[in-house]
Amino acid sequence: MNDNLKKKFEELIVDKRMASALCVTFGNENNDYFYCGGRLAEDDINKTNINSIFDLSSISKFFTLIIVFKVIELGMLSLDDTITDIDQRFINLNSITIGDLLSYQFELKTSERLEKCSNIEELEHLLFNVTFSQNKGIYSDIPAMIIRILIEKIMNEDFFSLIEKWIIKPCKLENTYINIPDDMLSNTVSNNFEHRIIKNRFITYDHITRGICNDGKSQVFKNIKFAGHAGIFSSISDMSKLCKKFLNYELLSKKNVFSLGINRTGEKINGNYTKFFGYLCYSKHPIRIYSEVNHQLSEKTIAFGGYTGNQLTIDPVNNIYIFMAANRCHNRVTQIIPKADSNKYIKMMNGSKTIQHQGITYIYTKDFVYARDENVIDPIVEYLLS
C-alpha cells in the first residue's frame, strides 16, 4: 500500500472527521492489505487494530446471502419456489418466489414499525402478515428478515448456527459474533451517542453501548438470534479471510458467485433510472453518484453499504475485494428531518458540515457515502486495477 492511499484514508477521519475509527482491508484471492486509523471511541485512548470489532449493520446481508445460496446448492431450495411453498404463515405472499424476494421485485410493508416490537414473536407476527405492492427496486430489510425464517424452517436449524458451520469455521473467523464476548468488548468500536435533529428536536441515542447493534430491528433480537438483515459484528481481519474464500469459490460455486450481482431491478423509465439491485445486494448503476459499485468494476460486482459507516465490494471478474468499517454515527449528527430544515442548522467549518448545539460543535455525516467513495473506495479501485 502506498503513502498516497494512507493519506486519503487519514483525510476521512483526521481532516473531515467523518468518524473516530476507520479500518480498511482490500486485495484479491491471495493477497491482502490492511489499514487501521483512529481510536475505538473519542474518549478512548486505544487505537484501532486489525482485530477491532465493528457493527457490520447491513453488511450482515452478505452472510445471509451466502447461506441462502448454500442451501440452494444443497438442492433444498430453489429460486422458483414460492414463499408459501415453504411456510404458509406468510399468508399474503403466496405468489412471490424466492428469486422475487431476494431481488426486490416487490415492495414489502408491515402494518407497524418492526423496531417498536417488544420481542421476537411480536416482530415475526408482523412479518407473517406483511403485504406487497407492485413497486420494483425498493430497498428494504424485510426480504433478508423473511429469508432467515424460511431457511430456518427448511434446515430445522438456527440461522446463525448455519453461519458458524458454513462460514465462521471454514474461514477460521475469530472476531465474528452476534453476541460479543465480554472480554472482547474492550476492542470493540463505539457507535454510541448518535445525534439526530427531528422536527427541531436534538435527539441523542445514548444506549448503543459496545456490543449493542445500532439497528433498531436487530435490537429486538437482543443478541440472542440473528435477525437476517443486520446484527453481525466482525473485524477487517475476519472480513479479509471471508472475502478471499468467497473469491476462491470455497463458499459458493463460481456460477453462483458470478450471478449474485447481476442487475435485476434497474431500468430507465421516462428518462430516470430506478435503483439497481442483484440478490440482496447493490449492483452497478449507470450513474456513479447513485452507484454503490465503482464504475471501473464489472457488472458482476456485488456491493453492500452499512448505515454505521461500512462498505463491502467484491468483483469476481477483476478478482478484487474491498471492505471498510467506520463508526460515522459515534458522537455525530447523522440526520436532519425534515431535510428542508438542513440549511438552518448546517455551518461549514474547515471544509466540513457542522452543527452547533449547546455550545458543542458536531460533525454532520449525512454525506458520509460520498466522502467514503472519494477517500477510500475509489482510490483503492484505482490502486488495485493499475
Question: What do these predicted ranges mean?
Answer:
Residues N2-F54, M76, S342:
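Short, conserved catalytic-motif segment at the N-terminal edge
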Residues L5-K8, E292-E299:
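Short Pro/Gly-enriched beta-strand edge/turn motifs at strand-loop
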Residues N248, G261-K268, P286-R288, N331-S386:
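Short, gly/Ser/Thr-rich active-site loops of penicillin-recognizing serine hydrolases
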Residues L93-Q296:
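Short, surface-exposed loop or secondary-structure junction motifs
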Residues Y33-Y35, Q311-T313, N318-R328, T334:
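Short, well-ordered beta-strand elements
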Residues F9, K61-T64, V68, L101, ...:
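Residue-level preference for non-acidic, small/hydrophobic
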Residues A19-L22, D158, T308-Q311:
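Short loop/turn microsegments at loop-to-beta-strand junctions
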Residues V14-L22, D44-L101, V130-I142, A227-A230:
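Short active-site loop at a secondary-structure junction
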